[in-house]
From Swiss-Prot:
It comes from the Bacteria. Belongs to the complex I subunit 4L family. InterPro entries: NADH_UbQ_OxRdtase_chain4L/K, NUOK/Mnh_C1-like. The gene is nuoK. It is a multi-pass membrane protein. This is NADH-quinone oxidoreductase subunit K. NDH-1 is composed of 14 different subunits. Subunits NuoA, H, J, K, L, M, N constitute the membrane sector of the complex. Pfam families: Oxidored_q2. It comes from Rhodopseudomonas palustris (strain BisB18).
C-alpha cells in the first residue's frame, strides 16, 4: 500500500467517524443513535486495517477484531436497553428518557 492510498483510507475513516458522531449528537431516536454509533466505530476499525496493511503487520487486523467484538457487545446491550426503554416509556426519544426525578 502506498502513502497516498493510506492517506485516502484515513480520510474515509475520519469521515465515517465524523458522520457517526454527528448522527449520535443530531438524532433523538435511540435506535438511530445506536446505528450512528456503529458507523462511528467503523471509522477507527478501517483506520486500523489501513495502517496494518501499510506497515505490513497483523496488529491492525487484531485491533479490528477487538473493535468488532466491542461493537457486537455494544449492539447487544444497546438493543436490550432500547427495548426496555420502549416498553416502559412508550417512546424511543432520548429526550423523554433523560428526565430527572427528584
Amino acid at each position: 500500500m502506498t502513502g497516498t492510498a493510506l492517506t485516502g483510507m484515513m480520510i474515509v475513516a475520519a469521515g465515517l467517524f465524523a458522520a457517526g458522531v454527528f448522527g449520535v449528537l443530531a438524532r433523538r431516536g435511540i435506535l438511530f443513535q445506536l446505528i450512528s454509533l456503529e458507523v462511528a466505530l467503523s471509522g477507527p476499525a478501517l483506520a486500523f486495517i489501513a495502517a496494518g496493511a501499510y506497515h505490513g503487520d497483523a496488529e491492525g487486523q487484531g485491533m479490528f477484531v477487538l473493535v468488532l467484538t466491542l461493537a457486537a457487545a455494544e449492539v447487544a446491550v444497546g438493543l436490550a436497553l432500547f427495548l426496555r426503554i420502549r416498553r416502559s416509556k412508550g417512546s424511543d426519544d432520548s429526550d423523554a428518557v433523560s428526565g430527572l426525578k427528584g
